[in-house]
Structure formats: structure tokens, C-alpha cells
């Protein structure tokens, strides 16, 4: 019943316009969750007399438990063993399965700063708003955002980052490598990071995804229900948070002789850019400007019959492209 209620919460957009239904759903969730915990407690917890209705086994051996403390120690040791790549992010605002409305607002502000002020120290966040504590614990302390040359940038975990963070980055890299064969759902990536041995909380996943998309900006294509998303923005991330299953990512890398051709195209399209912006052009350095160009054309240009054959074919190919 609890799983069904969570499904309704995630997949019923009509709730956004029905405050009464939202209150009823929250009340039902609270009641069912409390009932579940009480029943689990009666089954699992040793009684005051030291008896237990359960027999506990770990690694094939029975563990005798005579107290609640003993059970807690066992569960703690089991969790440490199973989730051995869980990072120790000390931020109770966002390192949670469900975040509060105020924490969600701070996370939104942080993601907006990540997108708009990536090259600035502390992402241009001044003072001590809640998003600054999120930044310090999740991005700065791990080295995911650090100085790279004259500017700040998103990077792989730093040398001082804990092993768990390095393992998470490798898992994300393996996922992206697999996506080269075809787009993979963002919800699949989130499910991977929630499972053992990582055990990440859902609250931090959008922030980690933002790091990945911004670090691999010219290599990862983002799709919304099969349609290419040319610009990663804060509103897009708000939709990802609500419906990650509607989004997919694909890593796009070109090697060999074709890479030379793509580099030439990229140089032509970025002829007005600075030298820094023209370093190591990638496939998406071409795709994004072309996509933006075609979507911004006046309607009469897209419907006229006066275009040359090659120009018409290019427009049609870009419009109909799914990858």
C-alpha cells in the first residue's frame, strides 16, 4: 500500500491543482508509514525479556540477539558492509530521500548557480544561504567544483576526495560509456546510484546529475521524451526532478577520420568564439548551434519552396533527427 501511495504521489500531475487531495494523500502516507514501522518493530525488535520472534543470520551464520542495542549494532555493521561506497556528505537539508520545500528551493538555487556561474568561485554564491552549505558539502569538499587554470570548473573528484566519491564517478562513467550504444533513461542512472553499494539519497541526485552534464557538456546529449534538449536550464532540471523517467542521456563521441571533419565544422560554427571556447571541439559543439539555428528560423524560411535541395535536406534532417 505504501508503494502504491508513493506511485500516486509521483505520477498524478492532477494533484498539483488539488490541495485537498494532496493533504489527504499526505495524511494517508503518514498513517500507512507509521503502521508499517510499528509492525516491523513488533516483529524485529527483541522484547524486554530478551526473546525475539526472528532468527537473524549474517553471512550464513546465525547471530544471537538479546537486546535492541545488539540489533542496532548488527544492522549498522551490515549497512556499512553492503553500502561501502556511500559518501559521508554531511548535509541534512538535501542528503535525504525526501527534501522539504525550503530545501528544494535551496537546491533549485544551487543548480541555477551551477548553470549560470560555473566559472566563479563558490558559483558566485555570497553570504550563507542554505544553498551555500549544500555547495560546500557536496561540491567543494569533494573537489567536484574547483579551480582549473584561471577559472573554476566542474571536474572529477579531487585527489583528497574519499574513495566512495571516486567509485561513484567511475560508475557514472561506465553508465555513460554504455549510453554510447543508445540513450539511457535518467531514472536508470538514479536507480543505479540509489542501490548498493552507493546508497545515495534522492535529494542529492539532481545535483550530481548537474555536475555530470556540465562537466561533459560537449559529449552528453539530453533528451526529453526522445527530443533533443539543446540547452540545459533550471526549468529543465525542475522537470527532471519531477519526472526523471521522461529524460534520457547519451554520450556522443567521434573518433578516427570523421573526427577531423567534425572538428572543421565546429571551427566554422565557433568562428566568433574565444580561443578558450574553441578548445577541443566535440560533436555537440556542432549539434547545439545547428539545432538552435533551425529552431529560431522565421516560419516563412522553414515553409518556403525557394531553398536549395541541400539546404532543404539539412533542415529536414535536423528536424527529424532523434539522436
Where are these regions (language model features)?
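Extended alpha-helical scaffold and adjacent linker segments that couple domains
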Residues: 1-323
Amino acid at each position: 500500500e505504501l508503494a502504491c501511495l508513493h506511485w500516486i504521489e509521483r505520477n498524478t500531475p492532477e494533484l498539483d491543482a488539488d490541495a485537498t487531495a494532496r493533504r489527504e494523500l499526505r495524511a494517508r502516507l503518514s498513517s500507512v508509514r507509521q503502521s508499517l514501522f510499528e509492525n516491523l518493530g513488533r516483529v524485529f525488535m527483541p522484547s524486554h525479556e530478551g526473546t525475539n520472534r526472528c532468527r537473524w543470520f549474517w553471512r550464513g551464520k546465525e547471530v544471537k540477539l538479546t537486546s535492541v542495542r545488539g540489533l542496532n549494532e548488527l544492522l549498522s555493521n551490515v549497512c556499512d558492509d553492503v553500502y561501502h561506497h556511500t559518501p559521508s556528505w554531511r548535509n541534512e537539508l538535501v542528503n535525504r530521500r525526501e527534501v522539504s520545500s525550503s530545501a528544494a528551493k535551496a537546491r533549485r538555487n544551487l543548480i541555477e548557480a551551477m548553470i549560470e556561474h560555473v566559472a566563479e568561485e563558490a558559483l558566485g554564491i555570497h553570504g550563507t544561504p542554505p544553498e551555500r552549505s549544500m555547495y560546500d558539502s557536496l561540491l567543494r569538499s569533494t573537489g567536484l567544483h574547483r579551480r582549473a587554470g584561471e577559472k573554476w570548473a566542474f571536474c572529477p573528484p579531487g585527489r583528497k576526495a574519499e574513495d566512495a566519491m571516486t567509485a561513484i564517478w567511475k560508475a557514472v562513467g561506465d553508465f555513460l560509456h554504455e549510453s554510447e550504444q543508445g540513450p539511457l533513461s535518467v531514472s536508470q542512472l538514479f536507480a543505479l546510484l540509489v542501490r548498493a553499494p552507493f546508497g545515495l539519497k534522492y535529494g542529492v541526485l539532481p545535483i550530481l546529475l548537474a555536475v555530470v552534464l556540465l562537466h561533459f557538456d560537449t559529449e552528453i546529449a539530453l533528451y526529453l521524451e526522445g527530443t533533443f534538449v539543446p540547452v540545459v536550464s533550471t526549468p529543465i532540471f525542475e522537470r527532471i526532478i519531477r519526472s526523471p523517467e521522461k529524460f534520457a542521456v547519451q554520450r556522443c563521441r567521434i573518433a578516427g577520420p570523421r573526427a577531423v571533419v567534425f572538428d572543421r565544422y565546429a571551427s566554422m560554427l565557433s568562428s566568433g568564439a574565444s580561443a578558450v571556447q574553441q578548445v577541443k571541439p566535440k560533436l555537440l559543439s556542432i549539434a547545439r548551434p545547428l539545432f538552435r539555428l533551425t529552431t529560431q528560423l522565421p516560419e516563412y524560411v522553414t515553409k518556403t519552396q525557394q531553398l536549395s535541395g541541400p539546404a532543404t535536406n539539412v533542415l529536414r534532417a535536423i528536424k527529424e533527427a532523434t539522436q
